[in-house]
Amino acid sequence: NATLMNNTNGSTQTDFTSLSSSDVKGEWLETISEPKYEISYEQGMLIVKCAVSGKARELVATQNSFVAKILRNGTEDRFESDNFKSGDDFYLSYQSSTKGYVAVYLIDDSKNAYCLLPYQSSQDGKVRVDANTRYVFFNSKTAAPLFQPADVDEYNMTCEKAAETNYIYVISSPNPFIKAIDNAVAGLPRELKYEDFQKWLTKNRTADKDMQVEIKTISVKK
């Protein structure tokens, strides 16, 4: 688990993010309380203890396995990066061991959730993928065989402050699921409130024991 704290003009904002590990026989589903901190010093070292309440479930079945990589300014895996500059191209490579479905969301510094995949041209709200096939999303040149080039949404990272942190949620399941209800915004991906996104995600993960979520953190600087 990771807790991220940002201080802006004397106001502290806290985000709690759960990152699954292969040696943990459980999966974090939802945070239901604000983290509580205990700060102390021992032998000149800063010690921070954190406690948080939430919902989790036992892993009782073999999970769908997938690999997702954030790519900067290139579509090959050697371009994997979590550090972007404003204006950089954003791509994502994805490969799953099983056929199924995938969605991608971005959470920005302002706590807005943006649906990056399915693309805005999607009519059924889901993206079906084949097993053992490498896909690169957000590039019209790699649209085939899932999409036509004109259907692809391409993205350049932007930064209004000196530096920003974004969270990329890659959601994968062998079972069909449909994107969250969202709103069209001119010049931006479809958008919904972060709280509504979390409710949608928790509902789907509770209903689908095979659904997996990987959260990737990227920084964007001017």
Each model region followed by its residue ranges:
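Secretory-pathway glycoprotein ectodomains that are cysteine- and/or Ser/Thr/Pro-rich
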Residues: A2-K222
